[in-house]
């Protein structure tokens, strides 16, 4: 007897799925970008001390702390030390030409006269890392061949950004600026710069165009450390100078002018112990040496230094951890610090790729639908053995030879680009991008 066929079960869209007939409904936005403020939380910040420009001032003061400055110098140095290059959208000759143009405009590997210094972009990003947000105005000028080329990027410091203006959908529309113009008495107030004319760097953005300072988590440790240092200095002073004592006649009563004068003498000595003291004949002044030893404050300072370093993602020797490494899928062990550096390098590159590169490409290639991208590779290659480096040298030596077997040449060409770079194999596409720019990209006038 033939089995009766089962009726196919009707698929019912579950939570998070969508019926194919409703796919067109995904077009367009229904939810505007909203402010992340609730109760005492204003733009992700609950501490009034750190809200607005008052918070920026706190972060600026933190730069005078040795541990903070040391960590920032290390982070910024590692970010800059990577090998930065522009990767074309494809191996198409036009895409390679566009990438070479961007490479020349950004001044990568070229610090000659007439080139925009690549380090300026890092300087703007460093402000974003410290304060949460920073920007620069993109200024183009006409090149010798009629192309619009990068003249300069005018830094916009976070202290000069009064507010971000948004459109009706909650998207950023313009930056409102104010501040005194350097070299003159002019004061700019309420100047609006369209967002499309800027390159904006945001650190730790949650999607609402509100960055957060990398120093935010280090603030409690910095405040405690600063208060502790003041106590240590005060205690050390008392330990070295002694505790002042003033013996006055029994006839001097509390609340009298003589009593207030006695208090003033002791107070002045505490504030200025090197100054002389004039006393009435029957008054006696002395200092009492402290017999007990001062408490050891080094462990407390070390603890807060370690907390500052951890907040910045730095695994220094002050951070007493036994698990400062993390396993990744290729079997390497990458330190906490290196993971932090890579994350920041990607954050920097993403902003350049999103806010700057398209604005340099489209004025000169209006029909472009794909863009080159800024990317990087780490300077260190300690995880590769000498044998791997030797292999790369051998490949470079034989890959262009006519006598090389076809199978071996095909194998070399099939190597992933990341592996080719790791082995040190010369990348023809990258070399074409890095060729020195010719006179077509020179300026028709001097920069201001």
Swiss-Prot record:
A GO CC term assigned to this protein in UniProt: viral capsid
Protein keywords: Capsid protein, Viral capsid assembly, Viral genome packaging, Viral release from host cell, Virion
Subcellular location: Virion
Keyword Nucleotide-binding annotated: no
Disulfide bonds: none
Domain of life of the organism encoding this protein: Viruses
A Pfam family assignment: P23-45_portal_barrel
Region Disordered, residue ranges: 1-25
Stored InterPro entries: P23-45_portal
Family membership noted in the UniProt record: Belongs to the P23virus portal protein family.
Complexes and interactors: Homododecamer. Interacts with the capsid protein. Interacts with the terminase large subunit; this interaction allows the packaging of viral DNA.
Function, as annotated: Forms the portal vertex of the capsid. This portal plays critical roles in head assembly, genome packaging, neck/tail attachment, and genome ejection. The portal protein multimerizes as a single ring-shaped homododecamer arranged around a central channel. Forms the portal vertex of the capsid. This portal plays critical roles in head assembly, genome packaging, neck/tail attachment, and genome ejection.
Identification of the protein by name: Portal protein
Annotated source species: Thermus virus P23-45 (Thermus thermophilus phage P23-45)
């Amino acid at each position: 007897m033939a089995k009766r066929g089962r009726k196919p079960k009707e698929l019912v869209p579950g939570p998070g799925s969508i019926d194919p007939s409703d796919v067109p409904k995904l077009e367009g936005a229904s939810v505007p970008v909203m402010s992340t403020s609730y109760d005492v939380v204003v733009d992700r910040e609950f501490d009034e001390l750190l809200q607005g420009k008052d918070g920026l001032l706190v972060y600026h003061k933190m730069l005078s702390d040795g541990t903070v400055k040391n960590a920032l110098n290390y982070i910024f140095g590692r970010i800059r030390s990577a090998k930065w290059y522009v990767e074309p959208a494809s191996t198409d000759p036009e895409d390679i030409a566009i990438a070479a143009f961007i490479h020349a405009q950004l001044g990568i590997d070229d610090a000659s006269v007439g080139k925009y210094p690549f380090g300026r972009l890092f300087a703007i990003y460093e402000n974003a890392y410290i304060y949460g947000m920073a920007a620069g105005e993109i200024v183009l000028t006409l090149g010798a061949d009629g192309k619009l080329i990068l003249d300069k990027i005018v830094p916009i410091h976070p202290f000069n950004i009064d507010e971000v203006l948004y459109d009706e959908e909650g998207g950023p529309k313009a930056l409102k600026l104010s501040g005194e113009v350097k070299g003159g008495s002019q004061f700019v107030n309420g100047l609006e710069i369209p967002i499309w004319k800027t390159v904006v760097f945001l650190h730790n953005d949650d999607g609402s165009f509100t960055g957060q300072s990398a120093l935010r988590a280090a603030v409690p440790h910095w405040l405690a450390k600063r208060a502790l240092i003041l106590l240590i200095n005060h205690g050390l002073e008392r330990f070295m100078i002694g505790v002042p004592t003033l013996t006055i006649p029994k006839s001097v009563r509390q609340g009298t002018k003589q009593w207030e004068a006695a208090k003033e003498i002791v107070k002045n000595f505490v504030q200025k112990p090197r100054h002389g003291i004039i006393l009435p004949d029957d008054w006696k002044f002395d200092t009492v040496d402290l017999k007990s030893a001062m408490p050891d404050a080094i462990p407390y300072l070390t603890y807060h230094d370690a907390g500052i370093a951890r907040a910045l993602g730095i695994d220094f020797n002050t951070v007493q951890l036994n698990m400062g490494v993390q396993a990744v899928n290729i079997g390497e062990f990458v330190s906490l610090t290196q993971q932090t550096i890579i994350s920041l390098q990607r954050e920097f590159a993403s902003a350049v790729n999103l806010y700057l590169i398209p604005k340099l490409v489209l004025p000169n290639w209006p029909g472009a639908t794909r863009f080159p991208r800024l990317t990087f590779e780490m300077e260190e290659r300690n995880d590769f053995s000498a044998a791997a480096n030797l292999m790369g040298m051998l490949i470079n030596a034989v890959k262009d030879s006519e006598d090389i077997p076809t199978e071996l040449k095909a194998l070399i060409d099939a190597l992933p680009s990341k592996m080719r770079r790791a082995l040190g194999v010369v990348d023809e596409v990258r070399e074409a991008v890095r060729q020195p720019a010719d006179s077509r990209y020179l300026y028709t006038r001097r920069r201001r």
